[in-house]
């Protein structure tokens, strides 16, 4: 049996301000730092060990991983960063307040933008200063690989190659793996692992900073999954994520 630990970054500054974040590189809040440290202490107390960790190129995920590994006294662990684990790109919504958008466009429209499988938000213009196409961390990519907006379907399309080419082979070789990423890149992985339908994925919300454990068979098919720690607290945190896009 293999175990895979997924963890969404701790609360970010734009989570706190209820803004669409996407690829914008915002930092953790003090609460987010403490969430990450708590996760690390919990993983250590439960006896988890890792051989390799994967994360995105956005600081809220990378710093979450730092704090987790620091609490586990495993800061030497090999870490691989990939843009493919970045959050879903929210296009022209990036930086805007979710509740304000709900007041302007209605809760239903914002829910579609936030959670539907195949409907992207309005795209950024290529020359918009919010676009990441001039960011040095993506210098090795073709401009067309850097999105101007994404739906979850698009996020799945960029996350799954990384699963197939890096995460799954590492696990099959016997390595114990943790992935510190984002709400929608984790939703993409969960959708794939659990075979969640395009319609049902709308209802899945990933809470900040709580380790999600998957137990997988030799073919990396899920046997079960669960949040570490207080299950009721995890459910409440997921419900709070769901309510962010309401007026």
From Swiss-Prot:
Catalysed reaction, written as an equation: (2R)-2-phosphoglycerate = (2R)-3-phosphoglycerate
Annotated residues for binding of substrate: 8-15, 21-22, 60, 87-90, 98, 114-115, 183-184
Domain of life: Bacteria
Site (Transition state stabilizer): 182
Gene Ontology annotations of biological process type: gluconeogenesis; glycolytic process
Pathway field: Carbohydrate degradation; glycolysis; pyruvate from D-glyceraldehyde 3-phosphate: step 3/5
Pfam families assigned: His_Phos_1 (PF00300)
Record text on subunit structure and interactions: Homodimer.
UniProt xrefs under PANTHER family: PHOSPHOGLYCERATE MUTASE
Its biological purpose: Catalyzes the interconversion of 2-phosphoglycerate and 3-phosphoglycerate.
Record-given protein name: 2,3-bisphosphoglycerate-dependent phosphoglycerate mutase
């Amino acid at each position: 049996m293999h175990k895979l630990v997924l963890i969404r970054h701790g609360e970010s500054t734009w989570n706190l301000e209820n803004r669409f974040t996407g690829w914008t590189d915002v930092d953790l809040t003090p609460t987010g730092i403490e969430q990450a440290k708590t996760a690390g202490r919990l993983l250590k107390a439960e006896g988890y060990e890792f051989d390799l960790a994967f994360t995105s190129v956005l600081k809220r995920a990378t710093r979450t991983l730092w704090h987790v590994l620091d609490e586990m006294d495993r800061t030497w662990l090999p870490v691989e960063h990939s843009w493919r684990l970045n959050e879903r790109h929210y296009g022209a919504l990036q930086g805007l307040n979710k509740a304000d958008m709900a007041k302007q466009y209605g809760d239903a429209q914002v829910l579609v933008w936030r959670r539907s499988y195949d409907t992207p938000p309005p795209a950024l213009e290529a020359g918009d200063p919010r676009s990441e196409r001039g960011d040095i961390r993506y210098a090795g990519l073709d401009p067309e690989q850097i999105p101007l907006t994404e739906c979850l379907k698009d996020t799945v399309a960029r996350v799954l190659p990384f699963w197939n080419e890096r995460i799954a082979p590492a696990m099959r070789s016997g390595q114990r793996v943790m992935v510190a990423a984002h709400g929608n890149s984790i939703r993409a992985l969960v959708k794939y692992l659990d075979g969640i339908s395009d319609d049902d994925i709308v209802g899945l919300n990933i809470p900040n900073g709580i380790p999600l454990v998957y137990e997988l068979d030799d073919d990396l098919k899920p046997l079960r999954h669960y949040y570490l720690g207080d299950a009721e607290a995890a459910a409440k945190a997921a419900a709070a994520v769901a309510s962010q896009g309401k007026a």
